[in-house]
């Protein structure tokens, strides 16, 4: 059986990237909460 995690930078960015987060209200809330916490990395 193959491993379930088959990394792809493009898929990762498209699903969890900054532009995807900013496209919805919930995503913007995620980014803002991470900013408030002082996260170095906001999105994938």
Curated annotation (Swiss-Prot):
Q: Basic residues compositional bias: what residue ranges? A: 1-22, 31-44
* Region of interest called Disordered, as start-end residue ranges on this chain: 1-44
Q: Does the keyword Magnesium apply?
A: no
In terms of PROSITE patterns, this protein maps to: RIBOSOMAL_L34
PANTHER family in alphabetical order: LARGE RIBOSOMAL SUBUNIT PROTEIN BL34M (PTHR14503:SF4), MITOCHONDRIAL RIBOSOMAL PROTEIN 34 FAMILY MEMBER (PTHR14503)
Which keywords, in A-to-Z order, does the entry hold? Answer: Ribonucleoprotein, Ribosomal protein
Task: Supply the source organism for this entry.
Answer: Desulforapulum autotrophicum (strain ATCC 43914 / DSM 3382 / VKM B-1955 / HRM2)
Q: Which is an annotated GO molecular function term of this record?
A: structural constituent of ribosome
4Fe-4S as a keyword of this entry, yes or no, is no
Q: Which family does it belong to?
A: Belongs to the bacterial ribosomal protein bL34 family.
* Listed GO CC annotations: ribonucleoprotein complex; ribosome
Annotated GO biological processes are: translation
- InterPro entries to which the protein is assigned, alphabetical: Ribosomal_bL34, Ribosomal_bL34_CS
What name does this protein carry?
Large ribosomal subunit protein bL34
> Could you tell me which cysteines form disulfide bridges?
none
